[in-house]
Amino acid sequence: MATKSGKYWVSWANVNAKNSNSINDLHSEFQENVRSFIDALKNAGASVSISTTTRSKKRAYLFHWSWKISQGKCKPSDAKKLAGVDIEWDHGNIEKSKAGALEMVKGFGLAVPPRSIFPPSLSSNHIEGKAIDMTVSWTGNLKVKKKDGTVVTVAYMKNVNGNNLLHTVGESYGVKKLKSDAPHWSYNGR
């Protein structure tokens, strides 16, 4: 029997559909690029906190539909089924359905507007090991080396999505920023 959406599914996913936060789990070529970028950031004095590297399809499914339903971007009945995830998105009432989905969004710590304006993808680069969610922080100006050795001065900005200089440094290492999702970097910027 299906279990209604809600915080149960966060606990379930933490056992049955875990994320990784280890760089070692990334695709080998992207892993090298990420290591080099993070080393450059740390050598310049930045702190880097990694929240996610790889993600299972089941977790991506739960992220996607809980976000869309909680934000009113679709009806619970729009959610497709996924083998191995016996969830009931429709609580028989749209407000209860949205509340159950929102419990999941909060439990998973998903970015919602204005931090992220798009739902987590069903076919995320995280599934392929080609994306990383990380927070980069520092105070003042950061003098960081691009891959070619050029030093770039990057001023701290609270809104990382708008910090184009930081994005340029990452891109020089093959780590591209998705500008609509604060922590997300990948091999292709998606």
List where the protein language model places each region.
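Cell-envelope/glycan interface and biosynthesis
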Residues: 2-179, 186-190
